UniProtKB/Swiss-Prot annotation:
Region Disordered: start-end pairs: 1-27, 322-439, 451-476, 492-604, 1438-1471, 1527-1649
Originating species: Rattus norvegicus
This protein's UniProt keywords: ANK repeat, Cell projection, Coiled coil, Cytoplasm, Methylation, Phosphoprotein, Repeat, Synapse
Gene name linked to the record: Cttnbp2
Cellular location(s): Cytoplasm, Cell cortex; Cell projection, Dendritic spine
Low complexity bias locations: 15-25, 395-416
Protein name as catalogued: Cortactin-binding protein 2
InterPro entries: Ankyrin_rpt, Ankyrin_rpt-contain_sf, Cortactin-binding_p2_N, Dendritic_Spine_Reg/Scaffold
Amino acid sequence: MATDSASCEPDLSRAPGDAEGATAEAAKKEFDVDTLSKSELRMLLSVMEGELEARDLVIEALRARRKEVFIQERYGRFNLNDPFLALQRDYEAGAGDKEKPVCTNPLSILEAVMAHCRKMQERMSAQLAAAESRQKKLEMEKLQLQALEQEHKKLAAHLEEERGKNKHVVLMLVKECKQLSGKVVEEAQKLEEVMVKLEEEKKKTSELEDQLSAEKQRSAGMEAQLEKQLFEFDTEREQLRAKLTREEAHTTDLKEEIDKMKKMMEQMKKGNDGKPGLSLPRKTKDKRLASISVATEGPVTRSVACQTDVVTESTDPVKKLPLSVPIKPSTGSPLVSTNTKGNVGPSALLIRPGIDRQASHSDLGPSPPTALPSSASRIEENGPSAGNAPDLSNSTPSTPSGTAPAAAQTLGAAPQNHSQAPPVHSLHSPCANTHPGLNPRIQAARFRFQGNANDPDQNGNNTQSPPSRDVSPTSRDNLVAKQLARNTVTQALSRFTSPQAGASSRLGASPGGDAGTCPPVGRTGLKTPGAARVDRGNPPPIPPKKPGLSQTPSPPHPQLRASNAGAKVDNKIVASPPSTLPQGTKVVNEENVPKSSSPQLPPKPSIDLTVASAGCPVSALATSQVGAWPAETPGLNQPACTDSSLVIPTTVAFRSSINPVSASSRSPGASDSLLVTASGWSPSLTPLLMSGGPAPLAGRPTLLQQAAAQGNVTLLSMLLNEEGLDINYCCEDSHSALYSAAKNGHTDCVRLLLNAEARVDAADKNGFTPLCVAAAQGHFECIELLTAYNANINHSAAGGQTPLYLACKTGNKECIKLLLEAGTDRSIKTRDGWTPIHAAVDTGNVDSLKLLMYHRVPAPGNSLSAEEPKSGLFSLNGGESPPGSSKPVVPADLINHADKEGWTAAHIAASKGFKNCLEILCRHGGLEPERRDKCNRTVHDVATDDCKHLLENLNALKIPLRISVGEIQPSNDGSDDFECEHTICTLNIRKQTSWEDFSKAVSQALTNHFQAISSDGCWGLEDGTLNNTTDSCIGLGTSSIQSIMLGSIPWSTGQSFSQSPWDFMKKKKVEQVTVLLSGPQEGCLSSVTYTSMIPLQMLQNYLRLVEQYHNVIFHGPEGSLQDYIANQLALCMKHRQMAAGFPCEIVRAEVDSGFSKEQLVDVFISNACLIPVKQFPVKKKIIVILENLEKSSLSELLGDFLAPLENRSTESPCTFQKGNGTSECYYFHENCFLLGTLAKACLQGSDLLVQQHFRWVQLRWDCEPSQGLLQRFLRRKAVSKFRGQLPAPCDPVCKIVDWVISVWRQLNSCLARLGTPEALLGPKYFLSCPVVPGHAQATVKWMSKLWNAIIAPRVQEAILSRAAMNKQPGARQTASKKHPSQGQQAVVRAALSILLNKAILHGCPLPRTELDQQIADFKGGSFPLSIVSSYSKKKGESAAWRKVNTSPRKKPGHFSSPMWNKPDLKHEGMRNKSVPHLNINRSSSLSKQQSLENDLSMTLTLDHRLSLGSDDEADLVKELQSMCSSKSESDISKIADSREDLRTFDSSRTNPVTSAPVNLRMPVPQKEASPLSSHQTTECSNSKSKTELGVSRVKSFLPVPRSKVAQCSQNTKRSSSSSSNTRQLEINNNSKEENWNVDKHEHVEKRNK
């Protein structure tokens, strides 16, 4: 306690001293509160607050010591132990008022001090508050004065500036007016001159075009004629050259034959008896007829006439030899009529006779000359004639003319043989010398396959056998000599030791000498000399237009004789059924041949053999022969069985290095006659085995090769079953049997040989293995077999060619794929340094190159099918995968590998112009296009023009250029369909591109893009047409750019970096260039223009109106983007004001039906738009947006605000009542802007009172900006979908976009004519149209949803509101909408049907079949023909009613609606109650659409006795009539006349008959209305049956009035109109298909069951 008192006492002692000191100091300074400054007042206030705090502390301390002080004062002087003192205390306590305490009470003193302090505090506070208020008022007045002075100065300066400007402008305008007036006169004169010149130029141009077209036609005709003549000349020249060569060679050979025959005759005279002597000269005579020639060879070629060739007199010995003319294979052609018995099909005739002039028989010199006697007998056409030769009784008989020409067509048929061929030696001609060491087996087998020697021909003459016969007599008198000569055939074996021209097999090559180098394939060339001729009849003559073709027939083929049951081969019976092939020519022996006079084997029965016209050799054993032996070339350049018809060789050709063989190798009894009988004989298949001296006949290895080469599986299997046979035997060219089979693609033979353990890698002399030759020929099945048997897939031939290299040369992708999957090495090089990639590129085969570069080898254990999805990097049919979808498997070293000349694969592709191959190579990241060859040339140096362009763009960076408008905040202003970014093009940035070029490219791309999307012309504008102006018609240009982002790095046009653009983009990894447009945040509207496609000039004009008038309302049809425009303008104004230093705020108020005027007052007051009259206006800018004003009455909502809004000052206040009930005077200040949006096309009623107090901006659908907005918006969307490119006008996307635009325009046009402006639609609802390339159905589906959810309900509501406007005003109008009359329902259905036909479905680019599938999704549009009976009676205007019927020349009867027929009440009453409305919602849709459609369909249940009872309904119907019949309106003037352009739609898919076509051509006059005739009634059944069978008929859904004269026909209550101009089809009411009621689906189901 003592401490507390001690601590408080100094405070009490100091406080009065401080107060006195302050008072004295204040007195000195003449203290005056009014003169104090603000800082001094604040200091005094703080001092006062300190004093008050000190006072509070003192009070608390005194209160705490109060009790102690009281006790001390009262009892401090007494001692409680002293009774005297206690008595004294009590006395004092009980003393009266007169006796006071000894000391004064301190509490009273303290209270007095506190009262005084409190008074002083109140006084000072009042003085301080008055000082502050005065200070505030002073500051405010100062600021206002300063602002007024500044404004005055600005206005004065601005006034002077404007005066000067106006004066200058007036002077300039006067001057310009004078100049322009002069220019107008000059321009008018120039225009007239230019127009005159233009007309002249047009005339000249048209004349030149006519002359040019005529000249083109004439030149085309002359070119065709010239080509035809050149072709004929070439053909004739080749034929004449071949003929001359043949004649020269033939003349020489005939002289040689004469000398040889003389010598032989001398030898024959030395014989023992005369009969053998007779046969020998005849035998030698036959040698004159063996012929070998090549059609295209020069003097080095020598030919010997064949036995079957026609020989004329010695003066012209080879005049009748046929020439080779390529013809098409045809069994009916007289030139190819008898390719029989020799397996020589017409496809041998398809070889072009001049492909390779290197093929020739060049070494015919060593043959000893043989000559024909000059008196050779002449051959008649149909029989023999007596000859002049003493040793011949008859000449060789003739043959049908088709035989010789058919074989003659193969002249030069094997030009692919690049080797020189020696003369063909007679394989069976006899000789005087005998060979003592002849194999006895050959002699024994010689008669095994012989026929009778005395077989007569069809003319009764013995057939002269081919030169392979031992003896060849021609008369019946020499039969014995023939048989005796056969016994001495061994003497002829030694004749082949000397080189001489032999005769080819007769049947194997009909006139073998004219068949080029191809070997014969006939099987009966080794028949006995007396084989019977074929019974072919007289031949047709040769057409005269074939130059050089001999019309004199050659001798026929000898008859093929064999056993019907089978051919006996080495004591084995092998079945030989007759071959039957399509389009074959069946050869049948029709005569029995008399037996020989000497004992011989019995004649063999003939085989009925059909020779296929396709040219395939037919096996007599198992018909397993599948191909022909092509001319062998060491380079493997000729595929045997790929991409061409089978080549059937028809003569013998061997290399010149091979010497003749003995006759025993081809004698009739030789062991290889087994091959002849079994599968046909082709001597060229087996190269001659020995040279010089007598040689044995061909052994089993040779037969094995022949069987493998010809694909004779039966013979091959027989030979492989023999013991001791060397299956790996190789001929002189080192060709094994497996090699031959693989070369010709005989898969079965390859399989047999591999199973027999043939050497799979046996190589020929050039190093080619069977796998190599199979790859070169493209036989992928053989490759698969060989690789399965572990063939060396990386084997290199003599030149380094691997199987993969050869396959790439051929270009067979299956072979390449098999080899790659087998694991072959892609990098093996040839001797010239070429890799398989070089080979693939050299042929220009894109698929081969893709396989080499991208095909991955499947992992072990994975099947090919499992690997396909991973390795299927491209389609082998030519389709390319997108770049970057796969990585190449070949390394860069292989792609860049150079050959001996330094050329890479890219050099080859570029030099040959293979752009596709070069492009694939360029996709490899490691390609080095700058690599130089040994001549210091790069790929670009040797490239063609196309490839140079590709290489120039090779390293170009393709960076997309995008336009960004910033983020679009989600809102209800219609911006949900807007996108933030759009791709406009792709920039190609090359290494040499500079920053200046880059700036120009960006600017040009932006300019082109803006002009392309804003152009009102057609699609597909080129860049060259877009460079006329700097800004587009929507006002955007390069000046609209805010900034450009290179990835994330900002860049501006004209800016340069130290690095080039290519290096910069590469190193910074720039993926796109983004152009940011100036937007509201910058106080501009460019981004708003690009986003909404509203022209920039119009937006700027709207902004000017808002800033100038302060009160603006945007109104137009619903969906005209009013809300979006208002919000964007407000945002732009806000940022402009903020940039100027003024705060700004946007207030949005959404008006609905419950929004009251009081709520609007609260909005205005709370946001300081309305301020009290006594209050000064604020500097803050406030923008109020009232949205959806159409939902409230403008006069009620804004009526009280009109005057204050128009006069914004305190002079025109308005009293408003607040929400709390108080009222006060307010006014609108100048910094408040009011924007409103109204979704109405026009104002009506009391709303017109508001119109004059606001600035109205009307957004009409048929004027800008709405008119072209949709077109520009969808065009930009299409450009973005196509990555910045405008699609072609014929593209389906363009057609579907144009259709959507026309739908919007035609829909609004029809609604405007209908008088329902409240149903008009702005473009907003159509902005969400999906633009999907290749999927037009999605757009039609979207259109159906839009129709069901938006268009149809709005049309229904608008029509019903119009119909009920006058009849049921006020509150009853809503009830009328819910329960419309039947007439109103009919009008609604008619209107929907017309709109769907004329606005929606008209012009849809979908095909009719696809559109029919989509039609059912459009709800509420099925309006069948019906009529209101009372209308015609009431109005008496049936002629006007006729205008509703849009089909021409309609004859109305008693109509009734098949859709709305009310069923019999007795029978269907309960059903009507249970089914209240038609089932229109058949297809699934959104729940909103379903509810809307249900509401719509409930209004469409009609009674069949409906009528139009009101004048308003009649007016609506008249509008519908005029709309349907009028063709004057531009939007609907393109309605098609044909039935296909009008679409069918029905509310029921199961009843397609309840509709009729709508023909919008012309109205029908009243006089044509007549009852339906019975003829028309009959036709309806046909129409019905066709319709039920799926013939889609177009329907008309318009109400048609009943005709009075048709009321009697009660049996025709249904009708269906036709588009015919003369009659109308009517449907009988009696059929169940037409009896429509509410539950029609049940009837349909019953009928279907």
